[in-house]
């Protein structure tokens, strides 16, 4: 599946491959000491957010690609 922004598709594939490899080779074997794909995800997320803005896709009120606030901030609990 391609990304919302054509310029983001290669980043999406790179992140998907990294995540799937980490999930299968590390996480499922109990090695949970970090996700080596974090920076790839951030770059991909930024690209998608820019593509959405450039295409004027309305996303007001929609949380996507990771929360921007911690759970305690967003639900009002402490």
Curated annotation (Swiss-Prot):
Gene Ontology BP terms: apoptotic process; negative regulation of intrinsic apoptotic signaling pathway in response to DNA damage by p53 class mediator; phospholipid transport; pronephros development
Catalytic activity, reaction form: a 1,2-diacyl-sn-glycero-3-phosphate(in) = a 1,2-diacyl-sn-glycero-3-phosphate(out)
UniProt domain CHCH: residue ranges: 5-55
Location relative to the cell: Mitochondrion; Mitochondrion intermembrane space
Domain of life: Eukaryota
Signal peptide residues on this chain, from the entry's feature table: none
Site features described as Important for interaction with prelid3a, chain residue numbers: 27, 41
Gene Ontology CC: mitochondrial intermembrane space; mitochondrion
Matches recorded under InterPro entries: MDM35_apoptosis (IPR007918)
Pfam families membership: UPF0203
Coiled coil: 1-52
Motif Cx9C motif 2 in this chain: 37-47
Chain ranges for the short sequence motif Cx9C motif 1 as given in the UniProt record: 8-18
Cystine pairs: 8-47, 18-37
Major place of residence: mitochondrion
Keywords assigned: Apoptosis, Coiled coil, Developmental protein, Disulfide bond, Lipid transport, Mitochondrion, Transport
Tissue and organ expression note: Expressed in the developing pronephros.
Family: Belongs to the TRIAP1/MDM35 family.
Quaternary structure annotation from Swiss-Prot or TrEMBL: Monomer. Forms a complex with prelid1 in the mitochondrion intermembrane space. Interacts with prelid3a.
Function: Involved in the modulation of the mitochondrial apoptotic pathway by ensuring the accumulation of cardiolipin (CL) in mitochondrial membranes. The triap1:prelid1 complex probably functions as a phosphatidic acid (PA) transporter across the mitochondrion intermembrane space to provide PA for cardiolipin CL synthesis in the inner membrane. Likewise, the triap1:prelid3a complex mediates the transfer of phosphatidic acid (PA) between liposomes (in vitro) and probably functions as a PA transporter across the mitochondrion intermembrane space (in vivo).
Name of the molecule in the record: TP53-regulated inhibitor of apoptosis 1
Originating species: Xenopus tropicalis (Western clawed frog)
């Amino acid at each position: 599946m391609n990304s919302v922004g054509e310029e983001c598709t290669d980043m999406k594939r790179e992140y998907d491959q990294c995540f799937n490899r980490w999930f299968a080779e590390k996480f499922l074997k109990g090695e949970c000491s970090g996700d080596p794909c974090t920076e790839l995800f951030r770059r991909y997320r930024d690209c998608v957010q820019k593509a959405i803005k450039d295409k004027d896709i309305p996303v007001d009120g929609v949380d996507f690609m990771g929360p921007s606030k911690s759970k305690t901030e967003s639900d009002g609990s402490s």
